[in-house]
């Protein structure tokens, strides 16, 4: 806890190792953010706590590595996108946080990601120089978000109205994407016409002075970056490159904490690859060559159907995008997790009449369409398997059996029943099925995380103690030795 010239540090954190190194950094940072300059009122507490939280991440950039900082900031950002509006009651702006959430997730953790985005918006050199000057200008005095905005505008020569309007004064999180890219050969160079999009997670907001980094990758997987700026919901930018880009990426190095989470890697071995933050699993069944794979989880609703279909609802909350190099030549499948939990798909599902499917389009110019798939699980929690995973965008949707034209979508077939009792439960729960079985019982929580795996050996009953589990909905799958789900049920832990 910060007190001027006397920062309190808990005894338990002095334990002879580095496990509380982050806390030491956080509290020490209050010598500047909180003591030297303090927030003008409690609603602006992010100027104290958000900046100290940023410091507790950023010190690892220099002490350990830039990749360590990037990974830990990304973990923090993922938690904000998924949970902050739940733990803090709603989407909150940073400058007017209610007193009951003064020390909540938005102030601390989202505050840190906004500082991260501000650093990359200005550039690190300008950012650190400007913040040192800000601390001197307001030394031993209070400052508000408006004060910081105006000071940075005057000091850097850049109008910070747009940035603060989008990131500080508006609830939710901006979302930036590339709608399309057109490449033309011009002599020995390549001209790239970029068409850009802006959305917003949580609230409807347009804003201006948007900026994010673009990555251009060639056939050898070399990448160069440049920055784009635009106002409003749509933008355009022209870039000249020394090589022909095979792939154009939004924010490839996570320098802007917008409403996306991304994971990328080199795909050079067959097998399963898990993307827990995105609720996705990749199955590489056969590879003809190495490939570069990227999955983006967009935490905003997908574009609407160009021609509405009565009774078909697309997710109002999220969608996925698969991109990469050499992907079309590979034999790939994908598994998408769905759950009506509040942090994922609660706004999509309405009743047991809903039947979940995955829709696909190659790019934003195309219409969403049905693709071969099958489902494992229940109407409100489970997985959808896509039999042929191609580059493009994927979204959850729900439909009923009366909709014409979607009956070809395969859904889960009736499976042997797993009985669970008592259900709901607060402690021990028994699972029973008709015939003895060998394989495993997989427990997945409502966020898509596997919480328990129990081996089964020639048995038709098992008892589990759930007394220490987190409350919520769980999907239970019975899988044979080949990893195929043969039965499932759900339980509620109170």
PLM feature segments, named:
Residues 266-267, 398-421:
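Residue-level detector of functionally pivotal "anchor" positions at catalytic/ligand-binding pockets or at interdomain
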């Amino acid at each position: 806890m910060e007190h001027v010239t006397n920062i309190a540090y808990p005894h338990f954190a002095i334990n002879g190792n580095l496990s509380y190194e982050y806390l030491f950094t956080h509290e020490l940072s209050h010598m500047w953010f909180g003591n030297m300059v303090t927030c003008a009122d409690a609603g602006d507490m992010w100027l104290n706590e958000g900046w100290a939280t940023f410091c507790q991440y950023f010190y690892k950039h220099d002490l350990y590595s830039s990749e360590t900082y990037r990974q830990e900031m990304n973990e923090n950002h993922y938690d904000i996108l998924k949970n902050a509006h739940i733990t803090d009651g709603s989407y909150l702006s940073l400058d007017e946080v209610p007193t009951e959430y003064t020390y909540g997730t938005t102030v601390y953790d989202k505050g840190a990601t906004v500082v991260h985005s501000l650093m990359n918006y200005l550039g690190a050199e300008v950012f650190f120089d400007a913040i040192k000057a800000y601390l001197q200008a307001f030394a031993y005095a209070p400052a508000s978000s408006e004060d910081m905005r105006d000071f940075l505008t005057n000091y850097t020569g850049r109008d910070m109205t747009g940035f603060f309007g989008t990131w500080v004064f508006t609830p939710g999180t901006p979302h930036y994407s590339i709608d399309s890219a057109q490449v033309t050969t011009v002599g020995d160079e390549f001209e790239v016409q970029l068409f850009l999009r802006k959305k917003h997670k949580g609230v409807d907001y347009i804003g201006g002075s948007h900026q994010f980094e673009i990555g251009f990758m060639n056939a050898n997987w070399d990448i160069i970056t440049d920055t784009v700026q635009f106002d409003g919901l749509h933008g355009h930018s022209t870039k000249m490159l020394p090589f022909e880009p095979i792939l154009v990426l939004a924010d490839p190095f996570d320098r802007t904490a917008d409403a996306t989470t991304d994971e990328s890697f080199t795909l050079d071995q067959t097998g399963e690859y898990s993307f827990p933050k995105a609720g996705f699993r990749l199955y590489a069944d056969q590879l003809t060559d190495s490939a570069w794979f990227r999955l983006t989880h967009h935490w905003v609703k997908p574009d609407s159907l160009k021609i509405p279909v009565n009774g078909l609802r697309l997710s109002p909350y999220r969608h996925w995008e698969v991109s990469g190099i050499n992907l079309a030549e590979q034999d790939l499948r994908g598994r998408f997790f769905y759950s009506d939990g509040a942090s994922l798909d609660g706004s999509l599902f309405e009743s047991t009449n809903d039947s979940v499917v995955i829709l696909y389009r190659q790019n934003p110019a195309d219409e969403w369409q049905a693709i071969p798939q099958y489902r494992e699980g229940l109407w409100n929690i489970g997985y959808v398997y896509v039999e042929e995973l191609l580059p493009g965008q994927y979204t959850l949707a729900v439909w009923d059996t009366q909709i014409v034209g979607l009956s070809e979508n395969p859904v889960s077939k009736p499976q042997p029943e797993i009985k669970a009792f008592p259900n709901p439960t607060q402690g021990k729960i028994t699972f029973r099925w008709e015939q003895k079985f060998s394989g495993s019982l997989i427990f997945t929580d409502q966020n898509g995380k596997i919480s328990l795996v129990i081996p089964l050996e020639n048995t038709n009953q098992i008892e589990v103690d759930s007394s220490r589990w987190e409350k919520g909905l769980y999907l239970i799958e019975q899988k044979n030795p080949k990893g195929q789900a043969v039965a499932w049920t759900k339980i509620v832990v109170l």
